[in-house]
């Protein structure tokens, strides 16, 4: 990586921390005010939108969304692949009003961000205490059904930071909730963001995340004994979609992970081969009385 690239990587990393802290503080104020007027359920949406616009302005990032019409009818449980810090930026763009999130309990104690999440109704999960986590999720399900809201879950359970077009194995919590409440699952697939952010390779580029929101999947006829199979099918569908979307388009001013460079080369080769395949083949006729010299000349000219 060049000196300028390394400088940009650290500068943008610092800017993200500042943006998170600033928007977290804003979120604390917004959560208090929204709670006072009986609108606590809007605090996360308001703060998420703020973070989206701040990051877009500061870092030259954006989000392109396909299938947003699939979020029109609540209640539902949204699930998405979990990759990096930029997931918060993506949330800021598509987060529906009245939606809330689940998060690991350790985030609750992060200054500003954790305080905002606690005040705005986030459901914190301690995975080392299974029954407590189940009770918390059931509480979230009750709220979602009663008030026709949405719940956002990252079924991978942690950020993958992967530079491959794949996802970690899914935990089953979101699917148990959906089956129990008979509410649909809405899969959200985000393009691989290692071309935008990757601590492993020192990547922090400007660019655009591509988000595809799939159609809601009914759980009306889903039984408990089929939840594992159902979760695997949903994951397979999401991974297939991820492979279709590929990597996030980036303006490479730091560096790129090798997997993304290889993928770009393969895509280029496919386009070239497709173009060659679709080009009409010139028709060349050679009469019987053409001598060997002229025949060779004709073939050479055709090539």
UniProtKB/Swiss-Prot annotation:
Residue span of region Disordered: 278-303
Pathway the protein contributes to: Phospholipid metabolism; CDP-diacylglycerol biosynthesis; CDP-diacylglycerol from sn-glycerol 3-phosphate: step 2/3
Coiled-coil portions: none
Catalytic reactions of this protein: a 1-acyl-sn-glycero-3-phosphate + an acyl-CoA = a 1,2-diacyl-sn-glycero-3-phosphate + CoA; a 1-acyl-sn-glycero-3-phosphocholine + an acyl-CoA = a 1,2-diacyl-sn-glycero-3-phosphocholine + CoA; a 1-acyl-sn-glycero-3-phosphoethanolamine + an acyl-CoA = a 1,2-diacyl-sn-glycero-3-phosphoethanolamine + CoA; 1-hexadecanoyl-sn-glycero-3-phosphate + (9Z)-octadecenoyl-CoA = 1-hexadecanoyl-2-(9Z-octadecenoyl)-sn-glycero-3-phosphate + CoA
CDD domains in UniProt: LPLAT_AGPAT-like
EC number(s) stated in the UniProt entry for this protein: 2.3.1.23, 2.3.1.51, 2.3.1.n7
Keywords from the UniProt entry: Acyltransferase, Lipid biosynthesis, Lipid droplet, Lipid metabolism, Phospholipid biosynthesis, Phospholipid metabolism, Transferase
The keyword Phosphoprotein is assigned to this record: no
One GO cellular component, as annotated: lipid droplet
One GO term of the biological process aspect: glycerophospholipid biosynthetic process
Chief place where the protein resides: other
Result, substituting residue 44 to L: In allele suppressor SLC1-1
Keyword Lipid biosynthesis appears in the UniProt entry: yes
Motif (HXXXXD motif): 82-87
Location within or outside the cell: Lipid droplet
GO molecular function: 1-acylglycerol-3-phosphate O-acyltransferase activity; 1-acylglycerophosphocholine O-acyltransferase activity; 1-acylglycerophosphoethanolamine O-acyltransferase activity
Biased composition (Polar residues): 284-297
Job description of the protein: Acyltransferase that catalyzes the sn-2-specific, acyl-CoA-dependent acylation of lysophosphatidic acid (LPA) to phosphatidic acid (PA) in lipid particles. Together with ALE1, plays a central role in PA biosynthesis. PA is the intermediate, from which all glycerophospholipids are synthesized. Can also acylate lysophosphoinositol (LPI) and lysophosphoserine (LPS). The fatty acyl substrates include 18:1-acyl-CoA, 14:0-acyl-CoA, 12:0-acyl-CoA and 10:0-acyl-CoA.
NCBIfam families per UniProt: AGP_acyltrn
Free-text domain note: The HXXXXD motif is essential for acyltransferase activity and may constitute the binding site for the phosphate moiety of the glycerol-3-phosphate.
Similarity remark: Belongs to the 1-acyl-sn-glycerol-3-phosphate acyltransferase family.
Protein name per the record: 1-acyl-sn-glycerol-3-phosphate acyltransferase
